[in-house]
Amino acid sequence: MFAVIETGGKQYLVKEGSIIKVEKLEAEEKKEVEINKVICISNSGLSYSSNATVKAEVLEQCRGEKIIIFKKKRRKNYRRKTGHRQYITVLRINEISLQK
């Protein structure tokens, strides 16, 4: 059984037991979070208003890989190099359920 969930403005295809990295969630490590924005489950096209939920455990709160931003204007000796690391949450999907 698989589900497509939405969190942090992005969509993720998840299965039970899979580990995903999502945008930062306000949850402590080793706690369980419940995601209600389920777009579809298995092969049925269920919408947001369906009674589907996905339960996941927060494995860690960390930062992603560094992204380099480099700006340059040719012939003007203008160069700026900065970096950014986004805060992410690592989740393990425990249960995909559909309440009737």
From Swiss-Prot:
Keywords: Ribonucleoprotein, Ribosomal protein, RNA-binding, rRNA-binding. One of its GO terms (cellular component) is cytoplasm. The keyword Hydrolase does not apply. Signal peptide: none annotated. GO terms for biological process: translation. InterPro entries: bL21-like, bL21-like_sf, Ribosomal_bL21, Ribosomal_bL21_CS. GO terms for molecular function: rRNA binding; structural constituent of ribosome. SUPFAM superfamilies: L21p-like. It comes from the Bacteria. PROSITE patterns: RIBOSOMAL_L21. Part of the 50S ribosomal subunit. Contacts protein L20. This protein binds to 23S rRNA in the presence of protein L20. Belongs to the bacterial ribosomal protein bL21 family. This is Large ribosomal subunit protein bL21. It comes from Wolbachia pipientis wMel.
